[in-house]
């Protein structure tokens, strides 16, 4: 995190003050390689999820169904590495996730180390796709590719959790980023197939699809087109998006030999409680006050109610963001990031690596300086709040307040003297 701040001060600050074409991009690329390289030799950091991935793949390999059975039904070396919390839970991930796991475990047998190495390679491939796509998206939208790469890819949350933690977000976000880039180049079929493939990895990828529909509308019915043409293009684009994404998922489901059981598990688990999720944060604030008047009140009961309310708010928020971000391609990319933010704020469970879907896009759509600063602060705060063993400090108020102060001073130092209008809105 400290190195990221220093890179912001020495490379990004001068570029924001006096923009040069492609200025600072090569420096950030070299720094990114230097930061990622040591992590390629490291074991899982900040999470043990990769062992669950291996376990789920071994279950499919051995004839079990991870959508209806927990890991405990298939004892072996992988199970010993799975957290106790997840040994009796089903998986919410899609058929591509299980297919990859089956292929990996079929290749390595029950060798845990070899399996982890292969997942490290897969996470690196996803990360490379992100690092390749994001500057190109920024360039296409007239934003600064160096700023986009520093803010969205080199930040500590992305590197720690996608490379260090080896989360399947790496492949999912890599596919979505590549799909959005394809859409900006009017390769809409490729874009939808890429997003559909990402959905087969993790369902949240589908959030990007409605914004690709706006891009299709702008291309096939540009400004000045008749209302009837716009309506026809909109309807046909929507139908094409739904059909192609379903086709991609169906093909992967069929080829992998898995099932559609993930649709019933897509809401995920509710065991994780941390204030990154809005319903949990609201419960943490409300519960002490409720206890004053209702000493027997249950934290979990209040949380369950707020999670239900938050789900309704999420649906309303997603529709609102989609509708408001319809003007042009820049709006569509900005809306994709905003929609992911809405989803994760109101989701029942939010973990730090979920923010990869948001952070990666934040520098691509010519964000105003205040938004760059805010994103920098959030990335710093989240990046240092989770330790290498996966525990967090979000209920340590001295830590929280201290890190907010540190993040604020870091932001002032990084962006000292940068004019507000230098990064156009």
Regions found by a protein language model. Name each.
Residues 21-124:
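Intramembrane catalytic core of multi-pass membrane enzymes that act on lipidic substrates
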Residues 208-246:
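Perimembrane helix-loop-helix junctions
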Residues 22-30, 134-155, 330:
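Transmembrane-helix signature of polytopic, membrane-embedded enzymes
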């Amino acid at each position: 995190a400290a190195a990221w701040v220093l890179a912001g001060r020495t490379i990004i600050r001068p570029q924001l003050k006096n923009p040069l074409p492609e200025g600072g991009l090569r420096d950030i690329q070299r720094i990114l390689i230097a930061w990622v390289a040591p992590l390629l030799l490291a074991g899982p950091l900040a999470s043990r999820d990769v062992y669950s991935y291996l376990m789920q793949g071994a279950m499919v390999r051995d004839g079990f169904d991870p959508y209806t059975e927990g890991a405990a039904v298939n004892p072996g070396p992988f199970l010993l590495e799975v957290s106790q919390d997840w040994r009796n839970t089903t998986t919410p991930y899609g058929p591509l996730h299980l297919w990859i796991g089956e292929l990996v475990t079929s290749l390595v047998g029950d060798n845990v180390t070899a399996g982890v190495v292969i997942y490290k390679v897969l996470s690196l491939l996803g990360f490379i796709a992100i690092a390749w796509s994001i500057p190109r998206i920024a360039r296409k939208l007239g934003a600064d590719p160096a700023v986009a790469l520093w803010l969205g890819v080199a930040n500590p949350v992305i590197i720690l959790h996608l490379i260090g933690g080896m989360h399947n977000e790496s492949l999912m976000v890599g596919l979505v980023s590549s799909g959005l880039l394809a859409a900006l180049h009017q390769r809409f079929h490729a874009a939808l197939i890429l997003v559909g493939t990402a959905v087969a990895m993790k369902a949240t990828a589908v959030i990007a699809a409605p914004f690709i529909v706006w891009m299709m509308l702008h291309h096939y019915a540009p400004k000045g087109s008749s209302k009837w043409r716009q309506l026809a293009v909109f309807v046909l684009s929507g139908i094409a998006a739904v059909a192609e994404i379903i086709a991609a998922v169906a093909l992967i489901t069929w080829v992998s030999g898995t099932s559609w059981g993930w649709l019933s598990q897509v809401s995920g688990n509710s065991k994780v409680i941390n204030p990154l999720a809005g319903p949990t944060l609201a419960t943490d604030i409300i519960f002490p006050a409720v206890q004053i008047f209702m000493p027997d009140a249950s934290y979990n009961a209040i949380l369950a109610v707020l999670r239900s309310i938050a789900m309704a708010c999420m649906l309303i928020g997603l529709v609102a963001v989609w509708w408001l971000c319809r003007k042009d391609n820049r709006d569509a990319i900005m809306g994709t990031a905003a929609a992911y933010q809405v989803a994760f704020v109101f989701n029942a469970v939010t973990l730090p690596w979920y923010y990869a879907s948001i952070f990666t896009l934040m520098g691509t759509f010519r964000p105003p300086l205040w938004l760059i600063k805010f994103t920098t602060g959030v990335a710093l705060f989240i990046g240092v709040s989770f330790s290498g063993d996966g525990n967090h400090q979000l209920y340590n108020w001295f830590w929280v307040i201290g890190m907010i102060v540190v993040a604020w001073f870091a932001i002032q130092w990084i962006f000292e003297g940068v004019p507000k209008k230098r990064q156009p809105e």
